[in-house]
């Protein structure tokens, strides 16, 4: 089967690796243009491009996909199937109509829940216990096409978005492999999505990470997990922005403390009151320094019990 693969970030790599390993004919890889990255704003290649170059696969990086030129380019590649995994652009119907087997997408949620750009993060932020992978036929909407295969994975209480991302990326490759086998032997069933059950996972920005200490300890902990490694949860301490990398839930009991109050300072972390319950902050980072444990931070900085975070 001749495939054009479309993907951009690390999430897409295991699926592309699987296609190469299983000896599918990958005619080309389509990925987003190179972009400035990091503090130095040096131009960086998408991870999928790096993999394609190492494996001698043609790379296309269109700035727009809704152009006659791009449609013509895909048509000239004569794919039997398009495969997408976190490509980052919605494909026009003209492109989807080119391959005889259509377009299969690898999505990081159990559709119709968490349609959109950041399903992994929002599943954790919202406190889900289970998520998974759905392969689906792509249509012109945003993750609205017929579902094909699903696989579930449990989300542990302390799992971060980064950890879940890596597990789902690998699971996605396995589900894609099974999907392609069923396409080849004509045993694949299409399941329309119950659109009335759809929920959405919009793209994250840095403001999402702002901790509201009036929320429950569980909600605060979920936000910290769901924004690790990006954009990272944060609060303010003595007027300085403080990133909060790692927390744990100490208890979920009612109390009379002002939310955000530091109740205890110790080598195990900062115990902080939330709207309901308390969390322990274990790892922090200030703009001028590296990420560090609270034990490391309090060795060189005085942190007082009774001080209030978020100010």
From Swiss-Prot:
GO terms for molecular function: methionyl-tRNA formyltransferase activity. SUPFAM superfamilies: FMT C-terminal domain-like (SSF50486), Formyltransferase (SSF53328). GO terms for cellular component: cytosol. The lineage of its organism: Bacteria, Bacillati, Bacillota, Clostridia, Eubacteriales. The keyword Protein biosynthesis applies. It catalyses: L-methionyl-tRNA(fMet) + (6R)-10-formyltetrahydrofolate = N-formyl-L-methionyl-tRNA(fMet) + (6S)-5,6,7,8-tetrahydrofolate + H(+). The gene is fmt. Pfam families: Formyl_trans_C (PF02911), Formyl_trans_N (PF00551). This is Methionyl-tRNA formyltransferase. Attaches a formyl group to the free amino group of methionyl-tRNA(fMet). The formyl group appears to play a dual role in the initiator identity of N-formylmethionyl-tRNA by promoting its recognition by IF2 and preventing the misappropriation of this tRNA by the elongation apparatus. It comes from Acetivibrio thermocellus (strain ATCC 27405 / DSM 1237 / JCM 9322 / NBRC 103400 / NCIMB 10682 / NRRL B-4536 / VPI 7372).
